[in-house]
Amino acid sequence: MSQGAIACVGPRIPIARMRSIFNMAEVERKLAKLPEREHEALRGTYQRMLDKGPQRFQVKPSGLPVMDELYEELPNFHPVLDDVRRQIALCEDSGDALEITPLLLLGPPGVGKTHFARQLATLLGTGMGFVAMSSLTAGWVLSGASSQWKGARPGKVFEALVDGDYANPVMVVDEIDKAGGEACYDPLGSLYSLLEHDTAGNFTDEFAEVAVDASQVIWVATANDARAIPEPILNRVNVYEIEAPDAAAARRIAARLYAAIRGQHDWGRRFDETPSAAVLERMAELAPREMRRAWMTAFGNAKLAHRGTVLCEDLPEPGLKRNPIGFTH
């Protein structure tokens, strides 16, 4: 089928070709050198690599995809979507692989940064890896820890490529500005080479000590404050300031979520096709991340009241926080 510059009228099936991400002979040599009955975790990793083999899908859209729904669903991400669309256009009718410059999404919590990354993976037809930097204290989470250490394991990048099906997954580094780690180890140190196309092609995880090709990974980092991010990282990414959606956009997001939740559940048919303007106005006061929980609460309250219409009184109170669990002083 021709892949000329033809307007796309619907979703396109991604084009996939195979890409080798590691050298089988190198893995075999490493496995053969392991002492008997030692380094069982490392032995299992090498065996898993040999069993699955080095070939992974490298995917890209088979043409310029229709992105109207994404523009509608993510109104505060238009500049990012514009750049993604341009980079897809460059490779859509060529033999070139898809290249997307690493993205850094800056903005307050709850504006949809992580949701955008999931939608990007869906748009491109690839997988997604996720690292929540704020919840981690181990500095080796991205690049792995030496197999000499007790409890060591491969890093998230290695796992996404070796255990996954794709050579070019979307890799999300969430809340990169909150990266912790031991004082003697920079948890973001491995990103300096991973975010550079040339050096990422020969990335060596410290646990497996086998080079893997991470050059095709599509990087999406999220953060609230750029001041906490090292300058070498900022120099390697395209930075986007993501604002909270305005009132009109927030109402559209709320309406789309209502329709999506209603359509995803059999019980949804018992509710009105669209919510009232007053309910949407109330929902628009919430951050996008909070809207789904609020709709589920509202649907449940309406059902308990034996109604098929969601009313303002069904919505949770604005600013209501979950009570902490544990002792109080």
What are these regions (language model features)?
Residues P61-L106:
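Pre-Walker A (pre-P-loop) alpha-helix and adjacent loop at the N terminus of AAA/AAA+ ATPase modules
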Residues R56, D165, A226-P232, E243-T309:
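Conserved C-terminal "switch" segment of AAA+ ATPases
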Residues L123-R153, A160, A250:
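AAA+/P-loop NTPase substrate/partner-engagement loops
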Residues R12-P65:
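Interdomain "pre-motor" coupling segment immediately N-terminal to P-loop NTPase/helicase cores
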